[in-house]
Amino acid sequence: IRLREFNMAELEYFIDPDDPPIDDLSKWPDRVCMVPDPDGPRPGEFEMSFKEALESGIVKHPTVAWFLAMTMEFLEFVGIDRTKVRFRQHAGSEMAHYASDCWDCELKGEHGWVEVVGIANRTCHDLESHEEHSKSSLLRAWRTYEKPVKKKSEVLKPVGSVIGPTFRERAGEVSSALSQLQEIPSSFPFELELPDGTIVHIGEDMVNSAVEDSVVSGEYFTPHVIEPAFGIDRIIWHILDHNYKEVDKEGERYTILSLNPEIAPADLVVLPLFDKDGMD
């Protein structure tokens, strides 16, 4: 459906891919309608809890399952009829290339099933793309080990008598860049990128290879991101659709809108029982 406004509420939720937060999904025991990837191993429509969906592998990530459960809880709180809710997994052919899993929450109303929420596991695509183009590693996070680890690592030590005359005023930048190499090149010469993007070529005579012992307390990693996106206007439209009704009582037509007091625009209203001059 097309509405006059298109307001979105989005969250970028960053997690450690090796240690994702895992919530107790048994807090949401009720079953909901799940529609897995039609091209996957379990096509069809199923009634299951979020815990069952995760344990069966239909939902691929615990944090995604948690957001699905929280979405259902929120929609019920604001007045959505749970019998008119389903969660549909994107088919492989429609999923964005950077996502490893993506689910839409759809609500049934006057215009059929309409997407109102999208929850995507965007993995590390965004931050790695930013790092690639900005040449900055500032968006990495630090993971502390439970116990410090002894580690042997190969390093390249600059030969000052060669680096200095070759690169002159930039010799310090070259030496610093060499000390920060994450992977040691397998052959010479190799290209080395400086902080400003300049590429220099390092020959075998410019460095000495050495093995150093160190005690490491942790490591930097690129966080993954789970992104829930809520279509505010579509949700409001379906709140009205699910809670508006007209009933006949004793020959009269009554129009009723039942809203959760938490979201109702007014706590109460006082109205006259009949129309009469001077009573309004």
Short names for language-model regions:
Residues I1-D280:
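NTP/phosphate- and nucleic-acid-binding module
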